[in-house]
């Protein structure tokens, strides 16, 4: 089965690579329209997936990721339209010039070919990835989690209908709907057909892909994100940022998981934090230094376990640790961070600059929420993933991350001397 999917995807990629921007946008507009027109079938399929997942004991955080609402589905369709409005990088001349030999040389952006994406209970990923791949002239093979099987099938059917109505092969967007995990291992060895693999899931999936894949892998999306509260920070403003970074949508990878508090601001800051977190329904996991103060406040607080500093809670839970200074905060982030998104809240711009320079994450913020690490927020449109590695992409992966380049030499029967 996968062999045939690979062949179909590779053949479709050749056709997609030749499309103009106008032709690709026409397909995307059709997909967005059909997602709204056929929303009832998609939402019904999703409701069945959610019911089964709840019966099987899926966590509330994962259920939130899985669930679609009419508003969320409309947002997904609008994201596709946003991709239409983005500049098409394919065909862009990056640089070039004329050599001494007279050969005119240019480096031009081209599609990667076929993208493989493995993901869990995130039905929006199906459309986000498909739209970005189509915009950049790439075919895609999707393997969603078993929790999303009905939703993905309904969504991909809509996308394939839109492709066919525009005269394009359905093989441009395909999904593996068999939940057999053995197919994941088989997919990881499809280097004959798949040019780049993107796993979007937990650490176990990433480890599996790194160890078994014969295809280049882009990993990321695991977000043990930190906020460091410097001693000069303005407490009222800090609380606004923390509420946003923790509670806006706790199940996302750019949600803050650990708060590092400078010891010189702890006495005045922790009581205010406890009050605010109690109002927000957040459970605090505090180190010994913070626990004594927080236990007298209104927020629910427990003693932090050492391993929780490495946890991506994806829930209304927040680690709180008192640190001696900026050096201590940076050392903690280096040990426990996942190079996703980390922030400093401060009025000391020298400390801010040190934090930016010394924290080696894909996104680093000064006086801002970690929740901004998102393709839409960065103006990239919907994202394929957030890469936390350094090759070949880093941070939110938009259109350019789905391209490579080729060198083109144009001569007049030019030969090398």
Swiss-Prot record:
Q: Which InterPro entries does the entry link to?
A: Ald_DH/histidinol_DH, Ald_DH_C, Ald_DH_N, Aldehyde_DH_dom, G-glutamylP_reductase_CS, Glu-5-SA_DH, GPR_dom
Cellular component terms, GO, for this chain's entry?
cytoplasm
Sorted keywords for this record are: Amino-acid biosynthesis, Cytoplasm, NADP, Oxidoreductase, Proline biosynthesis
Q: Which GO terms describe its molecular function?
A: glutamate-5-semialdehyde dehydrogenase activity; NADP binding
Q: Name one Pfam family in it.
A: Aldedh
EC number of this enzyme: 1.2.1.41
Pathway it acts in? Amino-acid biosynthesis; L-proline biosynthesis; L-glutamate 5-semialdehyde from L-glutamate: step 2/2
Any one biological process term the GO annotation gives? L-proline biosynthetic process
User: What SUPFAM superfamilies does the entry give?
Assistant: ALDH-like
What is this protein for, i.e. what is its function?
A: Catalyzes the NADPH-dependent reduction of L-glutamate 5-phosphate into L-glutamate 5-semialdehyde and phosphate. The product spontaneously undergoes cyclization to form 1-pyrroline-5-carboxylate.
Task: Name the family.
Answer: Belongs to the gamma-glutamyl phosphate reductase family.
Q: What HAMAP family does the database record attribute to this sequence? A: ProA
Name of this protein: Gamma-glutamyl phosphate reductase
Give the gene that encodes this protein.
proA
């Amino acid at each position: 089965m996968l062999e045939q999917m690979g062949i179909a995807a590779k053949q479709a990629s050749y056709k997609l690579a030749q499309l103009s921007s106008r032709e690709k946008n026409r397909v995307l507009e059709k997909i967005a329209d059909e997602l709204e027109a056929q929303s009832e079938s998609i939402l019904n399929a999703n409701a069945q997936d959610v019911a089964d997942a709840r019966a099987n004991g899926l966590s509330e955080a994962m259920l939130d990721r899985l669930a679609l609402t009419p508003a969320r589905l409309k947002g997904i369709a609008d994201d596709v339209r946003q991709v239409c409005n983005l500049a098409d990088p394919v065909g862009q001349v990056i640089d070039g010039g004329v050599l001494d030999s007279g050969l005119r040389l240019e480096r031009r952006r081209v599609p990667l070919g076929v993208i493989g994406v493995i993901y869990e209970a995130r039905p929006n990923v199906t459309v986000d990835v498909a739209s970005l791949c189509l915009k950049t002239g790439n075919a895609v093979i999707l393997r969603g989690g078993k929790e999303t099987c009905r939703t993905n099938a309904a969504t991909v059917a809509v996308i394939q209908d839109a492709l066919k109505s525009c005269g394009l092969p359905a093989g441009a967007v395909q999904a593996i709907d068999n939940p057999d995990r053995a197919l994941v291992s088989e997919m990881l060895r499809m280097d004959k057909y798949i040019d780049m693999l993107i796993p979007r899931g937990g650490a176990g999936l990433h480890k599996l892909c790194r160890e078994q894949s014969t295809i280049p892998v882009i990993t990321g999306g695991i977000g043990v994100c930190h906020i460091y509260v410097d001693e000069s920070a303005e407490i009222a403003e800090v609380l606004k940022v923390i509420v946003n970074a923790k509670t806006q949508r706790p199940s996302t990878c750019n949600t803050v998981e650990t708060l590092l508090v400078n010891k010189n601001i702890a006495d005045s800051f922790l009581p205010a934090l406890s009050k605010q977190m109690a109002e927000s329904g957040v459970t605090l996991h505090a180190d010994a230094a913070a626990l004594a103060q927080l236990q007298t406040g209104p927020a629910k607080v427990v003693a932090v376990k050492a391993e929780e500093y490495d946890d991506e809670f994806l829930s209304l839970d927040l680690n709180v640790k008192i640190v001696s200074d900026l050096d201590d905060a940076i050392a903690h982030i280096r040990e426990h961070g996942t190079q996703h998104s980390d922030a400093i809240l401060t009025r000391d711009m020298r400390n801010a600059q040190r934090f930016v320079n010394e924290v080696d994450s894909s996104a680093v913020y000064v006086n801002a929420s970690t929740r901004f690490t998102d393709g839409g927020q960065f103006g990239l449109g919907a994202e394929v993933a957030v890469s936390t590695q350094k090759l070949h992409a880093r941070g939110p992966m938009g259109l350019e991350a789905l391209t490579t380049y080729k060198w083109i030499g144009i001569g007049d029967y030019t030969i090398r001397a």
